[in-house]
Amino acid sequence: MYTKNDIMQMVEDEDVEFIRLQFTDIFGNMKNVAITSSQLEKALDNRCMFDGSSIEGFVRIEESDMYLHPDLDTFTIFPWRPQQGKVARIICDIYRPDGTPFEGDPRYVLQKVIKQAEDMGYVFDVGPECEFFLFNTDDNGCPTTDTTEKAGYFEMGPNDHGENARRDMVLTLEDMGFEIEASHHEASPGQHEIDFRYEPAMHAADNIMTFKLAVKTIAKRHGMHATFMPKPKSGVSGSGMHINMSLRKDGKNIFADENDKFGLSQDAYYFIGGLMKHIYEMTAITNPLVNSYKRLVSGFEAPLHITWSVRNRSPLIRIPSAVGGGTRIELRSPDCAANPYLTIALCLAAGLDGMKNKITPPENIQKNIFSMSEEEKAERNIKSLPTNLSDAVEAMEQDAFIQDVLGEHISNVYINSKKDEWDRYCRAVTQWEVDEYLDKF
């Protein structure tokens, strides 16, 4: 735990000249206010103000004053910036002038759900698996969807053209305090994954935001563009953000039970039941873009069906083979376009709801779901996730549980914005339509 004096001393000792006060908007976009070291004490006293009306989804212009409250434990120095006059960052919570937390701050939403878990004696650990593409840029440095490689799963150089960039990403992340467990080339040409160690929920969400910034920054230094867009190209696997979850109580993983045939405790089953009950209505948050649903299609290992399994990778929820302290629940539908604070908050809230109300999940599915007929899926009562953003938003709009977790402000802003996004998509004339119809009609 850092103190104010710790931060002031580190800034002086490390020759830090600029500090970025970072925060995240409702839609998962990172924002910042940059200050010089001369203004740091003011910022650490929670006296740094910004115009909230300028941030999409925050507040109206007549109530725009907002204050940034730095979370001191998020202080880190950017390794890629100059080593004289260094640049550091601190992630901030957003408060109103009257000293109350701003209900539109995604971090505040997660804090509230974490508090519920803590009141029950639990620590929620989260380990994300973030996938991304590295593409070439054009002569002007603008991103393209072009890649000159044809590499697939676990390939290495020289076939993996992003190997050097990925190595530098790993080294940079380690300099920033990440514990990197593995990195590798993914299934599609130009696609990569870097896995970092699980952390308590808030730290994990902060890490996802930091991870995306670092990956994009290092890619640019290698003359490439990193994108977390779920499905940037047709005909290849999209990029997901699998969420691995476990609960600890008194230092012990409460999901583990060595006497169960699958190694799962009753609370783990209830947690799975809660996730399965709420996932359809959560999907507008976990998969927030029109493009997200082009990843969630058959033929590319993406989960479509609301089922669970042990080891089998075709269902929505998977129980990896690790046992004991490593026992965890893996939710496979989210993608990296999702706001990690809202996504993790909903995962925890849904799981706790399952535990509180003893929601028993259906029988697990060991068979490859993609090989099942529609009749067999109907017989087993296997339901599917929403197939498009419109259906997902409609489900969210009708669900009181999701809106209660997110709060009225975020729910209303998010739903209205996503309705507008869908409407703009429906009105757009795409290149596919031009290619398909122009010379036929």
Regions found by a protein language model. Give the residues of each.
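Glycine-rich, acidic/polar active-site loops that bind/position phosphate-bearing ligands
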Residues: 1-441
